[in-house]
């Protein structure tokens, strides 16, 4: 499942994103954030973090630097 999400994001980055002007108000961009979150936390938690990030991407949020959280050491 993790690989399917990664493929979907890579498809978006390669074929859809170049057609739109750059509008992401965050660094890293939402798609890069999603890739890193899914690679670090897996499909469920990484997908949750990605959706949460995308929901913050609107004109009323200041944006800025918003990295993927570090994985907690047990």
Swiss-Prot record:
A GO CC annotation given for this chain: plasma membrane
Pfam families named in the record: YidD
Membrane recorded as keyword: yes
SMART domains for the chain: Haemolytic (SM01234)
Coiled-coil boundaries: none
Compartment list: Cell membrane
Membrane-topology annotation of the record: Peripheral membrane protein
Entry keyword set: Cell membrane, Membrane
Keyword match Nucleotide-binding: no
InterPro entries given in the database record: Membr_insert_effic_factor_YidD
Organism domain of life: Bacteria
Family: Belongs to the UPF0161 family.
Its biological purpose: Could be involved in insertion of integral membrane proteins into the membrane.
Record HAMAP family: UPF0161_YidD
Name used for this protein in its record: Putative membrane protein insertion efficiency factor
Protein species of origin: Anoxybacillus flavithermus (strain DSM 21510 / WK1)
